[in-house]
Amino acid sequence: MNYTDENRGKIQNEEYARRIIDFSGMRYGNITPTDIDGVIEWHDTHVVFFEFKYDNAPIPDGQRIALERLVNNCTTAGKLTILCICRHRTPEGQQINAAQSLVTDIYVGGGGYVGGYWCAEPFGRNLRQVCDAFLGWRG
């Protein structure tokens, strides 16, 4: 499929997207792969990772650790980097509107041996608003 302005960011093949990837054969001790719901790499200067959770579903420890380390590694490489935890209550069978999902937590990357930190407060902003502010988007 050719990508156009009209279909960028949209699922191109819904049937394929519903397929589940079995990572059970990729276990290393107690370490198993995790997925990343979304990432924006902005002009080699900023990176935004995002993870979507239904309502108040927790982030498994292993996934949290992996995402924090990715954010910190990007920061060490000189990129301003954050991870947004987004919440939604989208009914099963409907597409989740990423831009309108509520950001409830933000992890800000720390470079080198300095770890990052979590901002957990009622931001009252959706993912689009947080990304616009972080990236300085004036679109």
Predicted regions and their residues:
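Conserved catalytic cores of phosphodiester-cleaving nucleases, focusing on short active-site segments
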Residues: 38-40, 46-55
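Basic, amphipathic alpha-helical patches used to engage nucleic acids or provide basic targeting signals
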Residues: 64, 69-70, 77
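Compact, well-ordered interaction domains used in eukaryotic information-processing assemblies
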Residues: 53-57, 69, 73
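Active-site-adjacent loop/helix micro-motif of nuclease/hydrolase catalytic cores
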Residues: 31, 56-66
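Nucleic-acid nuclease catalytic cores
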Residues: 74-103
